[in-house]
């Protein structure tokens, strides 16, 4: 197996990015859904802190993945796939990355505008409370998660991506 992508297949680095992202998202999305219905408690605070730390990790992982993707070819889709399907498959991936970044950024902004400090591993962020903005970013965060679930479903059931499964 090659480390880098070729025009016909994904390399080991892309596959590692893919499976780490998949594993983390499989944990993160249900964890967030569980948090929505929890009453305030020590347990909720602990789970929320884990959720935030994992979210920040997803943000950094996605940025690294996009940087890597910029400098490596993406394997071509099978020639038997219609042009419209190719375009849809590529757009789906673009929107997938946008939704992941939207979710992580809106989650961080929701926390900050709620008056909470955000530890970004390398530095701490803190801004002035604005509960109206916190609510808006919370709604964006929730909408982004529903969008992510739909996009992931479309990617994994659509014919254009099948020849390139990682």
Label the model's feature ranges.
Residues 156-159, 163-166:
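Single conserved hydrophobic/aromatic residue that forms the stacking wall/gate
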Residues 26-36:
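Alpha-helical transmembrane segments of multi-pass membrane proteins
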Residues 1-10:
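Short, Lys/Arg-rich, polar N-terminal cytosolic tail immediately upstream
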Residues 133-151:
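Hydrophobic alpha-helical transmembrane segments
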Residues 92-110:
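Hydrophobic alpha-helical membrane-insertion segments
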Residues 63-85:
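Membrane-helix interface/capping segments
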Residues 107-126:
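Juxtamembrane non-transmembrane "cap" segments at the membrane-aqueous interface
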Residues 120-138:
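Short, membrane-exposed interhelical loops at transmembrane-helix boundaries
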